[in-house]
Every structure is written in C-alpha cells, then in structure tokens.
Amino acid sequence: MEPPIQTYSPEWDEARKTRLGASDMGALLGVSPWDSPADVWASKRGAGRPQSDGSINTPIWWGHQEEPSIITAAVYEIVGEIDLPHVLTGWSWVIDGLMVSPDAVLTDEQTDPVDIPETLHALVEAKVVGLRSGYLWRLGPPQHVLAQAHTQMAVTGAVRCHVAARIAGAPVKVWPVDRDDELCAGLLNVVEQFWSYDDEPPHWEMLVEPVVRGL
C-alpha cells in the first residue's frame, strides 16, 4: 500500500480517475438507493456522468459543511471528554484500483499519517441524512454505508469504523462497526473483478451476492 495522500490534492485528483472509491461500493453491490452497478461502470469505464459544478446550497455541499461538527460530536460520544484520541482528517489511502478517504482517523498518539498503520485506533464516517432518507437508518447504518465502512477498513487496516449520522436534524448518533475480515476480503475481490472486465458482465449480480449476504 502506498503512503496516504492528502485528500483533494493534485495527487488525489489524479489517483481517483483510475480507482474506485469506498462510496462506490454500495452501488457496485447493488444495495445503493441512488446508483446502480451500471452507473459505476459508466463513471469509471465508460463515458461517465456529468461532474459536479461545485455549486453551493446542495445536499452534498451541506454535508461537507456539517461534517466537522458531526466528527466532533462522534468523538465525544465514542470516548468521552477524557483521554480524547488524536483525530486526523483529510487523508486518503490508495491501493491498486481503489482509494478510500475516511472522514476521520482516530490514532492512539500524535503521529505522521505515514505511520498510521502502527497507531491507528479507528475510523469515523460522518453522514448527514435528510428526512426523506431517514427510514433507511431505522435499524442502523444501511447496507451501502456498511459497504463503505468495511471497504475503508479493508484498505487502512482499521479494526473498527464508527458510523456517525445526523438524521433529519436530530442529535448525532454513533454506531460502531467492527471489522469482518471475510467481508473485507470479499469487497477487495469485487474491486479486482470490476477492473478485469471492460463492460458490466451479465453475471455480476451472482458474483457480488455472497458479499451482499455478509453486510
């Protein structure tokens, strides 16, 4: 695995052109409420979808604005006021065909991001959930979010990802998601299979079905 790179840097922008992201995995597995495997193929292997024009006052823009506050609330919820871990944000990890950008990384000691594998404590994934999507969270993080969390753990080596969500303006709620090595391996295999085809194969649903069962 290559050393982590700064999110939104020129290196990050170049790397994402030829790699899937953790947020693509839900769609690739067919469990995303918004995108399908075909959308991922079009985005990464085909003509692609229109890119965001950077407009403000959109759901994505607001998500980025609220993210730091959600992380702060989540860390307090996770460990309390005493013995707060060191929180690192703005870093991405890259492997062949895949790049993950956790919203926050909790480490046991202050460290350079390059040394994180030895000191990493857990990840935090922050979500802003609107009123209309709140039903997806009635039993906890939905499958597409679990796929994202496990993909991040698969690449970083973390053993836990705390999914923190602010649903319909309510206080932040945190769900700890523990690493499942079998699921992580299955997700990495899905990434490998994705890049081995030029077009979406007709049997793709059968290929990913064992991984979906593990979510």
Model-derived segments and spans:
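Nucleic-acid nuclease catalytic cores
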Residues: 60, 76-102, 106-201
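Helix-loop elements that line ligand-binding/catalytic pockets
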Residues: 199, 203-215
